[in-house]
UniProtKB/Swiss-Prot annotation:
It holds the Pfam family Zn_clus. The keyword Ribosomal protein does not apply. This is Sterigmatocystin biosynthesis regulatory protein. Residues 1-13 have a biased composition (Polar residues). The gene is aflR. Coiled coil: none annotated. Residues 76-101 have a biased composition (Low complexity). GO terms for biological process: aflatoxin biosynthetic process; asperthecin biosynthetic process; positive regulation of asperthecin biosynthetic process; positive regulation of DNA-templated transcription; positive regulation of secondary metabolite biosynthetic process; positive regulation of sterigmatocystin biosynthetic process; positive regulation of transcription by RNA polymerase II; sterigmatocystin biosynthetic process. Pathway: Mycotoxin biosynthesis; sterigmatocystin biosynthesis [regulation]. Transcription factor; part of the gene cluster that mediates the biosynthesis of sterigmatocystin (ST), a polyketide-derived furanocoumarin which is part of the most toxic and carcinogenic compounds among the known mycotoxins. Binds to the palindromic sequence 5'-TCG(N5)CGA-3'found in the promoter regions of several sterigmatocystin cluster genes to induce their expression. The keyword Zinc applies. Residues 28-55 bind DNA.
């Protein structure tokens, strides 16, 4: 059987006057109607030969972007000066709604081959590679900058406040480009010391408060110790420091804060970080300061003349800045409600001392845990010192640990003495109330 004259249908005249080859369907009409695979032999497939069917290949309707022969400009020719009739001829061959000549005249030349280039802006390959190189751990830089890690601030909170401020200033395209990079910054590893210089000048700083998102015990100890000195900067005369009047705290706030602080210190002592003498020493200082706040809450200072007059009720500040030390525990002894107790009148001193005495068992439990940690450190220090002295011929008298065993023994003794003194004073207040 003779095949149909397909060549006449598949070689139409192009707009430029030259003939172009039009694409045929890969499957013939008979195989397409039967939903079977065609072997694509031209002019007649093997299936049509076996069945004696006419084999015809239709012109494909989904030709995509038709390449016009003879119209394509060389690479060196400038593209902005494309004629309007060429644009109209190119758009006429595209599948979709018909485009008139008037609309093509008023439309910029964006239908030619360079048109897909703006889409590539959404995923630039250079930016992610650049940020990946900066944020990836580098052995050469990590060793050089490891000494700066101890002074780094909270990077996760810094970039969490940094990312939204930058995202708000972007348009739609920039936000689509840089959103993955900013997301990587907000969750990047805080140990990367190179991130400390990435702060934007207009970024909002994290609010300064007593709480922090640091999760390691040493930082929690330092933050807790600063929390116990709320008026430390009241009398500071360092150049450039703006001192503020000291604040007073109620008995209720002292009791509640000390509960939280003692619970925090107990969790620190249960961690392996407490095997270090610095951490245990900081916990001991926290216990000393907590006992100071307890005894300040138990003492009756209602007889102090002018104490209530010097207190500013609107700002909760004490105007007697020069008369008291900024490191002294100052508790406001005024009628107040603590838990289910109402402290007022002649019952004030007795109820305050009774509340403090009922909380001292927490301190006793913490002092016992501190003593165990100090004893473990002393044993480890003595064993390391004995092994070092046996291995060296000349003894220079140096210590294997920063704090000697004698210092740790005195620290434990002072903790117990301070606890006994606060308990005795609180009991004395109860007896004379």
């Amino acid at each position: 059987m003779e095949p149909p004259a397909i060549s006449q249908q598949s070689t139409p005249t192009a707009p430029g006057g030259t003939q172009g080859t039009r694409k045929l369907r890969e499957s013939c009409i008979s195989c397409s109607r039967s939903k079977v695979k065609c072997n694509k032999e031209k002019p007649t497939c093997s299936r049509c030969v076996r069945r004696g069917l006419p084999c015809e290949y239709m012109v494909s309707r989904r030709t995509g972007r038709t390449r016009v022969i003879g119209v394509e400009q060389p690479k060196t020719a400038p593209s902005p000066t494309t004629p309007t009739n060429t644009t109209a001829a190119t758009t006429a061959t595209k599948a979709g709604p018909p485009v008139t000549t008037d609309s093509a005249v008023h439309t910029p030349v964006i239908t030619t081959a360079p048109s897909p280039k703006p889409v590539q802006i959404q995923s630039p390959p250079a930016e992610p590679d650049l940020w990946g190189a900066i944020l990836s751990p580098n052995t050469s830089t990590s060793t050089d900058l490891s000494s700066l890690l101890s002074v780094n601030t909270n990077f996760s909170q810094l970039f969490a406040s940094l990312s939204p401020s930058l995202l708000e200033g972007m348009d739609g395209m920039d936000a689509e480009m840089h959103a993955p990079e900013l997301g990587a910054l907000s969750v990047a590893d805080p140990s990367s010391s190179m991130m400390q210089g990435l702060e934007a000048p207009n970024a909002a700083q994290p609010p300064s408060s007593n709480t922090t998102s640091h999760s390691y015990c040493l930082s929690i100890c330092l933050d807790t110790l600063m929390r116990l000195f709320p008026n430390a900067g009241a009398n500071c005369e360092r150049p450039g420091h703006e001192s503020n009047p000291g604040k007073l705290f109620t008995i209720e706030s002292v009791i509640e804060d000390n509960k939280q602080i003692l619970d925090t210190a107990q969790t620190i002592l249960a961690c392996r970080c407490a095997e270090d003498e610095y951490v245990v020493t900081l916990v001991s200082l926290i216990v000393f300061k907590v006992l100071g706040w307890y005894v300040a809450a138990a003492r009756d200072r209602s007889s102090d003349p002018g104490r209530e007059e010097d207190f500013n009720w609107s700002t909760a500040q004490d105007s007697r800045r020069g008369s008291v030390s900024s490191f002294e525990e100052q508790v406001l002894h005024l009628p107040t409600v603590v838990g289910s107790y109402c402290i007022d009148g002649h019952h004030q001193s007795r109820m305050a001392a009774q509340l403090v005495l009922s909380e001292l068992y927490r301190v006793q439990r913490l002092v016992t845990q501190v003593s165990r940690r100090l004893e473990s450190i002393r044993r480890r220090s003595s064993s390391s010192s004995s092994s070092a002295s046996s291995n060296t011929t000349d003894s220079d008298g140096g210590m294997s640990t920063p704090l000697s065993s004698t210092t740790l023994v005195h620290l434990e003794d002072d903790l117990r003495k301070r606890l006994r003194a606060v308990s005795s004073e609180t009991i004395s207040i109860l007896r004379h109330a």
